[in-house]
Amino acid sequence: DGALLAHILSIVATAGIDDRDAISRFLSKTFLASQMESETLEMRTDDVLHWLCENGMIDRTGESKQVKKRIKEMKTIDAEEEDWQDEMPSWANSASAIPGLDLIPKEESRTRRLSPRRGPAIFGFKKASMYEPSESFLPEPSAMTYSPTPLGSRVSRLYLNPISGRIIQDGLRKAMGIVSGEDNVGQVSPLSLLHLASCTPDFLPLWPRKNDYDAIQEALHGHERELLSTPVDLEEERRMKGTLVVHSWMDEDSLETIENDWGVQAGDLRSRVELLEWLLYAMRRILSEDESLARIDRGAHKTLFESIDEVHRRVRYGCKVDILGLVAIKGVGRVRAREMSDTLGVASASDVSLMTEGDRSRLSDLRGWSPRLVDKLVDSASKSVRRSR
């Protein structure tokens, strides 16, 4: 239950509600409590707390004497509030005094007499030996207290589904093993990081068309070494299609090409780009704040961080690595950046700020350009260079 996982992690990590009894009291006042039985809600809450503890989002910090005292006091207050007065109401007493008006006791309902059964006395049950044993957890003590881990706090502040946070951290740990040389089979590429983010429940996958399956299967098998995780819902084709579409975007394929190749229109592409941009940002933050991953290999940790940052910027701007320095200039998108790179060979704001009059003239002669636009971009590049000093 991703929603309940996120909400309980949030109230433990940020709301100061950090014991089992307080969590129950908080949830009992929510709309969810009106939609299910209290016992069911308590069981689901225990399951969620167990999952969060087992997956490194929160820690159990022991039973609190203060919480036990508070629970005892609250039980006394609740008992006083539930002291029912089961006496006859005043209106009934008044009505009974009216001549000719009697209170008639409710008669027992008559049941239809059934004929003797013809089948067995008991049916529809399985023998106990036929059931498969299932893992069960003891209920959390009411006085148990919890504290968020660094991972849990970060996941909560990033508004991630805790399952997404767990998938990302596991994938990053695998990537660290590859980059550090501990794993000599796998490889890390831009597609690896895109696919890791797309495997989370926070990503919205794309439905593959019939003619998409060959390309998707080819990618699944051809990039097998690069995959850092498996999809949360085992729908590999849908999530790989989302990965490949965004990969085409950051390889500078046009919107028309992406629509023709994948049947994905601009609005759907934009929504997936924004989701992956957010998830890659979250991935970068989780990696930077996870000291256990940094201790594996500081050099590999830095390399992986820089790789995620590069892919994040490529997804944001929809471009290849060589023009990342140009798209960061105000007013320069990926199309203009590519034209500047192909025409003049510039690659950074510093190069643009040093353009000669001849370079400016060549650029302004291109279709869609003008001397005024070129001067404006040179001014923006110069300001960017001054700010970076």
Protein language model regions, located:
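C-terminal helicase lobe
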Residues: 1-50, 57, 96
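Intrinsic disorder
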Residues: 2, 17, 39, 43, ...
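Long C-terminal interaction/binding lobes of large macromolecular proteins
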Residues: 28, 285, 336-338
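Accessory alpha-helical DNA-binding modules that contact the DNA backbone or grooves
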Residues: 299, 308-389
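Alpha-helix C-terminal capping/helix-coil junction sites
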Residues: 53-54, 341
